Amino acid sequence: MSDTESLNDALGLFDEPEDFRPEKPKEHYANYERIDVPDISKSKITNLKLQLVGSSPLWGHLLWNAGIYTARHLDKYPELVSNKNVLELGAASALPSLVAGLIGAKRAVVTDYPDADLMANIQYNVNTIIPDELKENVRVEGYIWGNEYDPLTIHLDGDKKFDLIILSDLVFNHNQHDKLLQTTKDLLATNGKALVVFSPHRPHLLEADLQFFETCKEYGLTPEKIEMVNWKPMFEEDEETAEVRSRVYAYYMTHA
């Protein structure tokens, strides 16, 4: 046996078995049903088959209660988005933006962290759910909170502000509150609204979640609580905290 053959055999000891690394989770799907489609909605599509990424460190692989609540809220109050400029931060599956596009947003800009899989997944949902005649009005953009706004406002055909900014299940990012609020302050139209919806996924940190609505005042924004409802919690593992985790909080924020 040659030295080369011996070396190759030795190196072969370190070859990974085919099943050594777990297979990357595949995308999966969730169905969302629009319960009350408003008369002014440009599309009467009711069933939305959402593709979700297989896994995500940013939790974009789940369809959260907050996203479902937000989508229903837009159908209930379509004037929030009809012929309006809409921005969604941290969109994940982009359900609220998709509903805004179906209702007839002038422009819906859907954003999330610029991860390739996440962006491709959002674009897939836009391509498969939004009718061709409305696709031009729904734009997908990777965005890191706190960065320059030009990549967002370039989609507005001359406008520089958004009539509605959607923050669905984002306030658990406590160290990002300032960036979220600065972005909201800077990009919200004078008479616009931000719609903030969340569930307390970590009940012991609920006060830190709610601090968002105190900190917003430092940015010249006024919070208005819409309601708190109880839905089925996303996870069943801890009965003691189930009630808190079942909560869905909804707020508006406007310029003071």
UniProtKB/Swiss-Prot annotation:
Residues that hold S-adenosyl-L-methionine according to the record: W64, G90, A91, A92, D112, W145, S168
Compartment(s): Cytoplasm
Entry GO terms, CC: cytoplasm
Residue numbers spanned by region Disordered: 1-26
Alphabetical list of Pfam families matching this protein: Methyltransf_16
Listed EC numbers: 2.1.1.-
GO-annotated molecular function: N-terminal protein N-methyltransferase activity; protein-lysine N-methyltransferase activity
Keywords tagged on the record: Cytoplasm, Methyltransferase, S-adenosyl-L-methionine, Transferase
GO biological process: methylation; rDNA heterochromatin formation
TM stretches of this protein: none
Family: Belongs to the class I-like SAM-binding methyltransferase superfamily. EFM7 family.
Protein purpose: S-adenosyl-L-methionine-dependent protein methyltransferase that trimethylates the N-terminal glycine 'Gly-2' of elongation factor 1-alpha, before also catalyzing the mono- and dimethylation of 'Lys-3'.
Protein name: Protein N-terminal and lysine N-methyltransferase EFM7
